[in-house]
């Protein structure tokens, strides 16, 4: 794997960490102080929603990264009915017999069970064992972006007189960024939910030849 790819991969991870830090800082230190001036009920309800959203966001992010969907040679003994070859495929790169929906990731250089895609921003392959964590991570990432968008607008409208010119520019940029992020995450989440209902992975959607055919053996 080239050094350039490794550098780009690390930059993507650092960029993601910076975005997480900015969203956390903006919610907790820029917006929340304004909300403290509102009614106790509103403050408590909104504060609990914001905190819960962030807790679940980081929880599912952790599990998405921690849980591995790798299928390696030592896992071959887990396969049953080896004689039924149509249930399995052979990886030419790993030289192992694996479940048919497993695919070889050229970035991880490993076979991934029901591989959906390689997530560059998380530096992790999304597959059978961590896919549901990834979808939940997307849900709470979308909620976080939506909270930032709407609460920033709320603060701008209700505390107009307290904001100076620099604050307006800063808040305007955050409204634009959170709106774009929220829309992008929402569309991507809808796409993943569609794939889930259709029983497809991202790879199978992009490359129809990878879709399961019970009467053929697939090699890749």
Residue ranges and their predicted role:
Residues 1-220:
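Membrane-associated feature with strongest affinity for ZDHHC
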């Amino acid at each position: 794997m080239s050094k350039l790819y490794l550098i780009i991969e690390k930059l993507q991870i650092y960029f993601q960490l910076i975005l997480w830090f900015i969203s956390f800082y903006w919610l907790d230190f820029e917006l929340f102080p304004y909300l403290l001036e509102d009614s106790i009920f509103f403050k408590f309800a909104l504060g609990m929603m914001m905190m819960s959203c962030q807790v679940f966001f980081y929880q599912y992010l952790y599990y998405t990264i921690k849980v591995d969907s790798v299928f390696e040679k030592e896992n071959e003994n887990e396969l049953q009915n080896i004689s039924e070859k149509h249930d399995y495929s052979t990886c030419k790169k790993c030289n192992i017999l694996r479940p048919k929906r497993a695919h070889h990731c050229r970035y991880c250089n490993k076979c991934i069970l029901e591989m959906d895609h390689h997530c560059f921003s998380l530096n992790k392959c999304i597959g059978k064992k961590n896919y549901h964590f990834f979808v939940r991570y997307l849900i709470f990432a979308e909620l976080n972006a939506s909270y930032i968008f709407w609460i920033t607008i709320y603060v701008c409208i209700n505390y107009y007189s307290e904001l100076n010119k620099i604050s307006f520019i800063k808040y305007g940029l955050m409204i634009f960024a959170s709106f774009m992020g929220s829309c992008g995450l929402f569309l991507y989440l809808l796409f993943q939910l569609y794939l889930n209902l259709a029983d497809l992975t991202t790879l199978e959607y992009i490359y129809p030849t990878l879709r399961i055919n019970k009467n053929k053996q697939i090699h890749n």
